[in-house]
Amino acid sequence: MKQVFLESHNLKNRFSGFGQFNYHLIKAMAHFPQDEFEIVLNAKNTSALKEEFGDTFKYRKYSSLTRHKPFRIKKKYNLWHCLNQNIKIEPFFNIPYLLTVHDVHFVKENSVEMQEKLKKQFKEKLQRSSAITYISEFAKQDTHAHFKVPDVPEYVIYNGNTITDITVPEDFKPSILPPKQYLFSIGDFSERKNFMSLVEMLRFLPEYNLVLAGNNTSSYAQKLTALVSQYGFKNRVFQTGKIADLKKQYYLKNCDAFVFPSHREGFGIPPIEAMRFGKPVFLSNNTSLPEIGGEHSFYWNNYNPEYMASQLKSGMEKFNNNKAFYQNWYTDRAKSFNWKNTAEKYLEVYKSLI
């Protein structure tokens, strides 16, 4: 039987965006057993995957050695799916190759030397590609703006919403709990996510606390913590670190609003997770966020803290004055991003390439 190889080693970090993408795509694909081909997963912990998915998939044990050219995987699969633009693991031979592009933010980030290295790596991926999928229209447009894209089939396939069912027990309480109403955001603590602008904004929102979830071990996190101390906000800004789904759902369910002032996104799953709870969503008006947020989310055009606070206050007033409409719109929009639909579209692309 024909085989489709999914380069899915990012499953090893479920807290990362790529890890989430890999896991939820594969989980959704499990609902569509294939007669025409087998799907092979490349993963470090194959036993956990076998326990969850059984013989729905085939499995290959990931080895970091395969990142290096002499040790590349030599099996000639009928299709190789590279699940993101940053992966260093490539097939040894020239075989049918599907590339999924989440973003090309690397053209604006990192040192000049690193930018050139990543551009070279990405150009090689483009030249390998038999087809390309993008997770948003913005990701496609941005790729075309910075690179010569080969004349191959291209598809925009949106990610799904990772939260479909709300499963927070009534008696559950996380260990970190603000004493009054709060705003919530989640993501890596990095310049790109721009969490410090939220701390600055709090100076003009004395009625709110702020909960920030995500990997907070970076140098940016240290700067943010210093800013919190500078303003005397230790009892107003709460950093949870990485959190599991239950805690994330709790904070989304109980926050007053979800705030996401990111500088750059290829898609933006956290906002649609917040929408599932009918929460007002405040986003940067840039990159993919207006595309994903839609017409009834609220947007910041700049990061002046007083302006951001004013936009939040006026947005909250609009939301509260027409709460039923906004809650219904948000939950409907969240449900429109469905991993089963996403998986079905990828499987159709596979069929077209093998």
Residue ranges, per PLM feature:
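Carbohydrate transferase catalytic cores enriched for Leloir-type hexosyltransferases
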Residues: 1-354
